[in-house]
């Protein structure tokens, strides 16, 4: 669909010069917040985005995709991004990285800016708070990672399967008093689904569940390990490698050497520092490859949005 307005029209309606509109479109400095808001309001009102030909004339790539991670320091998300980038480069796309910090408001702002720049597509690392309404305009050119949504392409991890694999391995090793360190249920995947899988295994095998759900941070793992270590506990399952790193530090300080740790992640850091920990690989690298491939196929009209589930494997 052709834009009814040009950059010149937006400049006139906003009462600014064309160069100012260009700075706003490119998210450049040198524009006051008040002016930026005025220009963005006009663009939003008229549904404006720059044409591909206009971008090409400014020397910008005609093939751009965005990757919106939740945290730039996330070990798991970085593993997925590492396989996405080569896939995009190979097909001639220039990826740009953005961070949501688990904020739906930030995601909305990022998507608004990306729409105005008329980029080709988005890989969005999902989290609780991302609604279908928020991402609705991107249905044909967005892939959710680690979350799913009706009608949208998604690449998800087998959260229940990952915990079941760990619990089964520990059970086969003779452990019957297995505690769990996880994430609050407000996080549907890493939190609720993994905790529910732990509880389901305990119920099936008549084990007594002992769990704490502090959060995602390493420090939270460290601070809450004591609350799930009973006198008869022989193993501790952690919902993430980050929690396992915190738990391991606590166990070392307390000189507890007989307790078996297990975690979901199999990140390079955990394997290097603690090769003794039983880990499950949820397929972060494969998820990155699949997400990039799915987005490229959608951009080129070769497939419709679909849900992909990456199987977990014992590392």
From Swiss-Prot:
List UniProt keywords, sorted A-Z: DNA-binding, Repressor, Transcription, Transcription regulation
Induction summary: Probably induced by trehalose-6-phosphate.
Q: Where does alpha,alpha-trehalose 6-phosphate bind?
A: 71-77, 126, 147, 187-190, 194, 242, 284
Looking at the keywords, is Protease present? no
Q: Which CDD domains match?
A: HTH_LacI, PBP1_TreR-like
Keyword set includes Lipoprotein: no
Ranges for domain HTH lacI-type come to: 5-59
PROSITE patterns for this protein? HTH_LACI_1 (PS00356), HTH_LACI_2 (PS50932)
Give a GO biological-process term.
Answer: trehalose metabolic process
- What does the record give as the DNA-binding region? 7-26
Q: Per its record, what are the GO molecular function terms?
A: DNA-binding transcription factor activity; transcription cis-regulatory region binding
Cystine residue pairs: none
Q: How does it assemble?
A: Homodimer.
- What's the stated role of this polypeptide? Repressor of the treBC operon. It is able to bind trehalose-6-phosphate.
Protein name in the entry: HTH-type transcriptional regulator TreR
Organism, scientific name: Salmonella typhimurium (strain LT2 / SGSC1412 / ATCC 700720)
